[in-house]
Amino acid sequence: MLSKFLTMEYLVHPGTLSLAAGVACGMCLGWGLRSHLGMFPQNSTSEANRDTETGTEASILGESGEYKMILVVRTDLKMGKGKVAAQCSHAAVSAYKQTQRRSPQVLKEWEYCGQPKVVVKAPDEDTLIQLLTHAKTLGLTVSLIQDAGRTQIEPGSRTVLGIGPGPVELIDEVTGHLKLY
């Protein structure tokens, strides 16, 4: 009990309080001046290396700052609503994981935009493959889902193509002509 009393007495000692107030004021003043004068710490070397590794990717990040993910569903397979939902979920999760690994900054931007996802129709597998090829040439993340074939459709059927997340301008260049599902 005596040690608690002595500790409390030391903490409320005028000299201790003055020291604490001085340190707090100094930190606030330093922080305020740093932000006012624009003196921010430089990027770490790992961040700088990552930026140079992704060079073109960083330069094509959406000019408007908008990002989205597109899920392209084949309509010729006549999948039920639940099947389409499951296949789209597989594509979205796969695309998310790829982007998290390859382009974490793109993923952050997409999340900041509200994680928009749009589902569109493709008439057949050939269209899906053409879209995949075009998206890859633009450097977009792609995720082609093949069904296991345990329920409604043949094993190995390519059901959904996930594109993105990525800059709206690039994704629209690939899928802008497709109709909503």
Curated annotation (Swiss-Prot):
Query: Main localization of the protein?
Result: mitochondrion
Q: What Gene Ontology cellular-component terms does the record carry?
A: cytosol; mitochondrial outer membrane; mitochondrion
EC number annotated for this UniProt entry: 3.1.1.29
Please name the GO terms of the biological process aspect recorded for this protein, alphabetically.
negative regulation of anoikis; negative regulation of gene expression; positive regulation of anoikis
- Name the UniProt key words of this record, in alphabetical order: Hydrolase, Isopeptide bond, Membrane, Mitochondrion, Mitochondrion outer membrane, Transmembrane, Transmembrane helix, Ubl conjugation
Query: For this protein, what reaction is catalysed?
Result: an N-acyl-L-alpha-aminoacyl-tRNA + H2O = an N-acyl-L-amino acid + a tRNA + H(+)
Q: Does the keyword Secreted apply?
A: no
Chain segments annotated as coiled-coil in the UniProt record: none
Top-level division of the source organism's lineage: Eukaryota
The GO terms this record gives for MF are: peptidyl-tRNA hydrolase activity
Where does the chain cross the membrane?
10-32
Q: Where is the protein situated, by its record's location annotation?
A: Mitochondrion outer membrane
Pfam families in UniProt: PTH2 (PF01981)
Q: At what sequence positions does the UniProt record place the cross-link Glycyl lysine isopeptide (Lys-Gly) (interchain with G-Cter in ubiquitin)?
A: K78, K83, K97, K108, K117, K179
Q: Does the keyword Hydrolase apply?
A: yes
Mode of membrane association: Single-pass membrane protein
Q: How is it modified after translation?
A: Ubiquitinated by PRKN during mitophagy, leading to its degradation and enhancement of mitophagy. Deubiquitinated by USP30.
| Subunit structure and binding partners | Monomer.
- PANTHER family in the record: PEPTIDYL-TRNA HYDROLASE 2 (PTHR12649), PEPTIDYL-TRNA HYDROLASE 2, MITOCHONDRIAL (PTHR12649:SF11)
Protein role: Peptidyl-tRNA hydrolase which releases tRNAs from the ribosome during protein synthesis. Promotes caspase-independent apoptosis by regulating the function of two transcriptional regulators, AES and TLE1.
Instruction: Please state which protein family the record places this protein in.
Output: Belongs to the PTH2 family.
According to UniProt, the name of this protein is: Peptidyl-tRNA hydrolase 2, mitochondrial
- Species of provenance: Mus musculus (Mouse)
Which gene produces this protein? Ptrh2
